[in-house]
Amino acid sequence: MVRILVKKFDKNIKLPAYKTSGSSGMDLVAYIKKKITINPGKTAMIPTGIAVAIPKNYEIQIRPRSGLAAKKSISVLNTPGTVDADYRGEIKIILINLSKKLFVVKSGDRIAQMILCPIAKGKLKEVKKLPRTIRGKGGFGSTGK
């Protein structure tokens, strides 16, 4: 297992945890003083009350919780969001309300999940032509239905 150092901004904050042995993500919870209401079609920045330090060559991806998306039409706006290895600020989640109803976030609500992922850095080399492929420039549905 890869060690993730976590700083809690309040002693009562519940640390993210894997819910099952097969889980790839850990749930993140809202850490807020007052309820936040997200109007239909609008966004809100939700603090989690934690900051992390992860090893070099890793990132934490912030993704929606499938239950919130399926049942309430609530998602993470910039999914997947990235927490870089050198970022030390509080993790905040940009939620978007895609439903037609108000959505209320309370402190302790599970609002997103975080997944630790290895990253590979690329080295760019400018060229005049790219190698040919069968697909070529085909995109946006060009490989079939």
What are these regions (language model features)?
Residues 1-145:
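DUTPase catalytic domain/fold
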